[in-house]
C-alpha cells in the first residue's frame, strides 16, 4: 500500500502554525553504503562527516570543481553508511556527479524512494509525536531511531521534526494525528526553511553559488580544517581572501505573484529600481504575506526596499535566526 500525499493549502508562519503533518514530496532521500562510504562522502562534501556522530545531522554542500554547489544535503548516519535529504529537483543530477568516482571505491550510491519523508511542526508537535514514538530527538540528540523510523530535530524557526520512515508507519502516523493535526504539502516545510534561513537549492540554482553565498558557514555546513574535497580550493579562497561578496537574505512583504527560483529582484535606488540578486525560493502564506529567500550582496542596508520585478508591492529584510559574524 502506497503512502498518499496531502492536498495543498497555503502555509502558515511558524508563529501561527497549528499542529501540522507535512508530506515532503519536494524533498528526496538518497543513501551511500559500503566499507568506503565515509571516506568517499568526506571527499565530496563541505562538512566534516568524520566528526559526525550517530546523534547528529549536518547541512553540507556538494560542489563542483569551481566550488559552486550542485545542491545542499541534510546528512545523517545510517547502518553502514549515510543518508541525505535534498530537493527532489536536483537529486538526479547530484547523484550523477557524486557517482563519477565511485567506480574506484567500495560504495553503493542510490536514490531511496521506498521510504517516506514527513514533517511534523506547529503547536505542541513534540507532545503529538510523544504519543507515537518511544523517544524523540532534541538539541543534544538531534537524530533518534525508533523501529523503521529515523527522526531529525530542527530548532528553527520553531521546534519541528523530520521523519524518515516506511509506508506503514507513515500511514499509521497520519491516522493517529488525523483530526488533531492539519495536513499540508511541501510548501509548509519550505516556508519554515525560508524562515529559518536554510538555503533551498532547486534545479534553477544548481551550479550557481559557492556555499558561503548561501550562509552555509553560519549553519555549520563548512569545515575549513578537513582534508580535500571537490571544490575545496575555491571555498577556502572565498573565506581566507574575502572573495565572497554575497549572502542569503530573508525578505517579507507583498507581491501580486509568487516569483520562481532563479528570478532576480529589484532594489529601490531613490526614484529608480535596479535589478539585483537571485531568488532561491518563495512562498505565499495564508495571511497573504510573501516570503522570499534570495542571494544578494552581503553589504545591503537593513532598511533596503525590494520588489518582485515590475510589481507594485514591496518587500523588506527580515532578520535571520543566526549571525553571519565570523
From Swiss-Prot:
Keyword Cytoplasm set for record: yes
InterPro entries per the UniProt record, alphabetical: GCV_T_N, GcvT/YgfZ_C, tRNA-modifying_YgfZ, YgfZ/GcvT, YgfZ/GcvT_CS, YgfZ_barrel
A GO molecular function held by the record: folic acid binding
Transmembrane regions: none
Pfam family of the protein (one): YgfZ_barrel
Keywords per UniProt: Cytoplasm, Folate-binding, tRNA processing
Compartment annotation: Cytoplasm
Keyword Cytoplasm: yes
Cellular component terms per the entry's GO annotation: cytoplasm
Superkingdom of source: Bacteria
Residues the record lists as binding folate: 27, 189
NCBIfam families reported in the protein's UniProt record: PRK09559.1, ygfZ_signature
Name of this chain's protein: tRNA-modifying protein YgfZ
Gene coding for it: ygfZ
Amino acid at each position: 500500500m502506497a503512502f498518499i500525499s496531502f492536498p495543498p493549502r497555503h502555509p502558515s508562519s511558524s508563529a501561527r502554525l497549528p499542529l501540522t503533518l507535512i508530506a515532503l514530496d519536494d524533498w528526496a532521500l538518497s543513501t551511500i553504503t559500503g566499507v568506503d562510504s565515509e571516506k568517499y562522502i568526506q571527499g565530496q562534501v563541505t562538512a566534516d562527516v568524520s566528526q559526525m556522530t550517530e546523534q547528529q545531522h549536518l547541512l553540507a554542500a556538494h560542489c563542483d570543481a569551481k566550488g559552486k554547489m550542485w545542491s545542499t544535503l541534510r546528512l545523517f548516519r545510517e547502518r553502514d553508511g549515510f543518508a541525505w535529504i535534498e530537493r527532489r529537483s536536483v537529486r538526479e543530477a547530484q547523484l550523477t556527479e557524486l557517482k563519477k568516482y565511485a567506480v574506484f571505491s567500495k560504495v553503493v550510491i542510490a536514490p531511496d524512494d521506498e521510504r517516506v519523508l514527513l514533517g511534523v511542526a506547529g503547536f505542541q508537535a513534540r507532545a503529538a509525536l510523544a504519543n507515537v514514538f518511544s523517544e524523540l530527538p532534541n538539541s543534544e540528540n538531534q537524530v533518534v531511531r525508533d523501529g523503521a523510523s529515523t527522526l531529525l530535530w530542527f530548532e528553527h524557526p520553531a521546534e519541528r521534526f523530520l521523519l524518515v520512515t516506511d509506508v506503514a508507519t507513515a500511514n499509521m502516523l497520519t491516522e493517529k494525528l488525523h483530526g488533531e493535526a492539519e495536513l499540508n504539502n511541501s510548501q509548509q516545510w519550505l516556508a519554515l526553511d525560508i524562515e529559518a534561513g536554510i538555503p533551498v537549492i532547486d534545479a534553477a540554482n544548481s551550479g550557481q553559488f559557492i556555499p558561503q553565498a548561501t550562509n552555509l558557514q553560519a549553519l555549520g555546513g563548512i569545515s575549513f580544517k578537513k582534508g580535500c574535497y571537490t571544490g575545496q580550493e575555491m571555498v577556502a579562497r572565498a573565506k581566507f581572501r574575502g572573495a565572497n561578496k554575497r549572502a542569503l537574505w530573508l525578505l517579507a512583504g507583498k507581491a501580486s505573484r509568487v516569483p520562481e527560483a532563479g528570478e532576480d529582484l529589484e532594489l529601490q535606488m531613490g526614484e529608480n529600481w535596479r535589478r539585483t540578486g537571485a531568488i532561491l525560493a518563495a512562498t505565499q502564506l495564508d495571511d497573504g504575506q510573501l516570503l522570499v529567500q534570495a542571494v544578494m550582496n552581503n553589504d545591503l542596508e537593513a532598511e533596503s526596499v525590494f520588489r518582485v520585478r515590475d510589481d507594485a508591492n514591496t518587500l523588506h529584510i527580515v532578520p535571520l535566526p543566526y549571525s553571519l559574524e565570523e
